[in-house]
């Protein structure tokens, strides 16, 4: 028997609907952590279904960090102004601003990395592996593995979420899509850091 308290806790932690929480707990035999994983998997499925829908409402949010040391401007889109005006959506956009301020991504997704940047990175990684004396037959695999690290450092959606390293920003986005029932797109951002690019 699944307790109402467990359902309530799962709802508070995931934002999923009551029946979804109850069913996930039944499937997980009452294990809340396992139920969270089940909901996240289902959330990903829900997010994939919504990905094709047009998102042209949303918010532009500004965030200034550290007494004016770092500034971030971000645009996040959703499908309706109703969702754009919810506290959950606003908080999500603020979280994205803080993520960008703290983790300094260069791109939104892997697909946004220019081909020439990727080729240059692969060249550097290949040279590093050769200099380390790695056998030629495993170099490509090593480069691919290290390229994943490059993506995790430089692509917003691949980064560890600053408040929960178990999640990526993409996981957070997919949870929000599942919770709010609309396609949500992180459209663009700009990050400024005082003194950046100035010769010291």
Swiss-Prot record:
GO MF assignments: translation elongation factor activity
Keyword Metal-binding among record annotations: no
UniProt-annotated stretches for the region Involved in Mg(2+) ion dislocation from EF-Tu: 80-83
Gene Ontology annotations for the cellular component aspect, listed alphabetically: cytoplasm
Pfam families recorded: EF_TS (PF00889)
Localization terms from the record: Cytoplasm
Record keywords: Cytoplasm, Elongation factor, Protein biosynthesis
CDD domains per record: UBA_EF-Ts
InterPro entries noted in UniProt: EF-Ts_dimer_sf, Transl_elong_EFTs/EF1B, Transl_elong_EFTs/EF1B_dimer, Transl_elong_Ts_CS, UBA-like_sf
Function: Associates with the EF-Tu.GDP complex and induces the exchange of GDP to GTP. It remains bound to the aminoacyl-tRNA.EF-Tu.GTP complex up to the GTP hydrolysis stage on the ribosome.
NCBIfam families attached to this UniProt entry: tsf (TIGR00116)
Similarity field: Belongs to the EF-Ts family.
PANTHER family, sorted: ELONGATION FACTOR TS, ELONGATION FACTOR TS, MITOCHONDRIAL
Name of the protein in its database record: Elongation factor Ts
Native organism taxonomy: Bacteria, Bacillati, Bacillota, Clostridia, Thermoanaerobacterales
């Amino acid at each position: 028997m699944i307790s109402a308290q467990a359902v309530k806790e799962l709802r508070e932690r995931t934002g999923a609907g009551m029946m979804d929480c109850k069913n996930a707990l039944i499937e997980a035999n009452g294990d809340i952590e396992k139920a969270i994983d089940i909901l996240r998997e289902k959330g990903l499925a829900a997010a994939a279904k919504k990905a094709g829908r047009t998102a042209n409402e949303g918010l532009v949010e500004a965030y200034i960090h550290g007494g004016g040391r770092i500034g971030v401007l971000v645009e996040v889109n959703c499908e309706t102004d109703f969702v754009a005006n919810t506290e959950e959506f606003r908080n999500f956009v603020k979280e994205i601003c803080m993520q960008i301020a703290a983790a300094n991504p260069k791109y939104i997704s892997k697909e946004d990395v220019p081909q020439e940047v990727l080729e240059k990175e692969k060249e550097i990684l290949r040279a590093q592996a050769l200099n380390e004396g790695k056998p030629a037959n495993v170099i490509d695999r090593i480069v691919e593995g290290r390229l994943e690290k490059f993506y995790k450092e430089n692509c917003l959606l691949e980064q560890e979420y600053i408040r929960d390293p178990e999640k990526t920003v993409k996981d957070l986005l997919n949870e929000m899509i599942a919770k709010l029932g609309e396609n949500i797109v992180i459209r663009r951002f700009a990050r400024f850091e005082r003194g950046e690019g100035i010769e010291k």
